[in-house]
Design a protein with these regions (language model features):
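Small-residue-rich hydrophobic segments that form or flank transmembrane alpha-helices
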Residues: 8-60, 126-168
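Hydrophobic/small/kink-forming positions within alpha-helical transmembrane segments
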Residues: 48, 67, 71-75, 104, ...
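Helix-to-loop junctions at the C-terminal end of transmembrane segments
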Residues: 75-88, 191
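Cytoplasmic-side transmembrane-helix entry/capping segments in multi-pass membrane proteins
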Residues: 89-98, 117-120, 141-145
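Symmetry-related core transmembrane helices of the 12-TM Major Facilitator Superfamily/SLC fold
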Residues: 94-101, 197-214
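C-terminal ends and interior cores of transmembrane alpha-helices
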Residues: 100-114, 213-214
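Multi-pass alpha-helical transporter architecture, strongest
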Residues: 110, 205-224
Length: 232
């Protein structure tokens, strides 16, 4: 029989919303003046290597700063959240509010065509991705989907061979892939109206998520919740 586990409701909602937000941010990056990804580093790292290979110092500097900004965001997330195990009460709210501030700060710079705005947005994405938590061995990331598609392929292959499949992992993969794709579509529509100011929308949403998470934690604490991940 497939392995059956539960993920708390707040984690389902939060994970879906954050993947949706990341989709908007990444779409805005691709449609912006540099046409680059913001929420993941695979392409950026390849382009850094290309810049080294072609001797383009300016591009190497740009991609190095983009990668470094993402890394700094992840470092900040590690310092704020501190633990990788998914659990209500972790300081996700503070991390999200900081991400919101970084995205707000990026908007006027992007509107002016400054790459510094991209670095701030990348730092925010690293901060969000650094919040990735582990639940019963499952990594829950929300800013890129390569791993999700890989996991889906593995699970489908295992199922075709008649092996046990972890249905919770499949549902998480489908959730993140679907909401990230929807966010990208919405991001494209928003960019057609707002241009580089599109990041105002994810900035507001991440701020609301941070505040909402903090209020939810207080609500659960007020009702004597233990804060265990199985609550919710």
């Amino acid at each position: 029989m497939p392995v059956l586990r539960q993920l708390p409701r707040w984690a389902w909602i939060g994970g879906g919303v954050l993947a949706f937000i990341a989709g908007i941010v990444n779409a805005a990056g691709y449609m912006g003046f540099r046409h680059q990804s913001i929420t993941n580093l695979t392409g950026s790292t390849s382009l850094l290597g290309v810049a080294f290979g072609t001797g383009d110092g300016g591009e190497a500097w740009h991609w190095g700063l983009s990668i470094g900004a993402f890394l700094i965001g992840a470092i900040l997330s590690g310092m704020i959240v501190q633990q990788s195990t998914l659990k209500l009460g972790r300081r996700y709210g503070l991390a999200l509010i900081l991400e919101s501030l970084l995205l707000f700060a990026a908007v006027p710079l992007l509107d002016a065509g400054s790459p510094v705005g991209l670095y701030l947005a990348a730092m925010g994405a690293g901060l969000q991705n650094g919040m990735a938590s582990t639940y019963s061995g499952m990594v829950f990331r929300t800013t890129h989907v390569s791993g999700m598609f890989t996991d889906l392929g593995i699970y489908i292959g295992q199922r075709l061979r008649g092996l046990e499949v972890d249905t919770l992992r499949i549902r998480v993969c489908v959730l993140v892939v679907t909401t990230f794709t929807l966010g990208s579509a919405v991001g494209a529509l928003l960019f057609g109206v707002l241009g580089e100011r599109t990041l105002l929308i994810p900035a507001v949403l991440t701020g609301l998520c941070g505040v909402g998470y903090g209020l939810y934690c207080q609500y659960k604490a007020g009702w004597g919740a233990t804060g265990d991940v199985d609550a919710g």
